[in-house]
Amino acid sequence: HICRTMWTSDNPIYEGKHYSISGAAAPPKPSVMPPICIGAYGEQIGLPMVGRLADVWNSSLHGNEDQWIKKRDIVRASAQQAGRDPKSIEISLTIERPLPTTDSESAQFADDLRHLIELDVSHFVLDFGHPKSTEPVLRFIEQVMQPVKTDH
């Protein structure tokens, strides 16, 4: 609430349960509102907060796909309860996985990303660790990233 108030008001005032501001202007006001991205995984507090307030949910695949879908659905239900369009919240997914080193690993990685896109993931944060050469990075671009982008 505070950030959006500061981005839209010449004389921002906000009184919340834990924080308040008065006259904390942050000129110049942005011409395009920056999206609010919240990374959360907790079903009691974090995910409902994402549904109420966030433009983007940064998630990760802890556990299995069914558990992740349950968490996505909590975000969507919370958005609906807050009077928001659940589909308006973009989903970002952090993936920690080594770069593919073979054609078959690349094909599997691309299929995995396509499947996640079908589950409404629109952004990926990819952590490949520390590649020792550019070869696996170039393989990823050519065999995974470009085909997936072409498909969607």
Give residue spans per PLM region.
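Active-site-adjacent structural elements that line small-molecule/cofactor binding pockets in enzymes
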Residues: 1-152
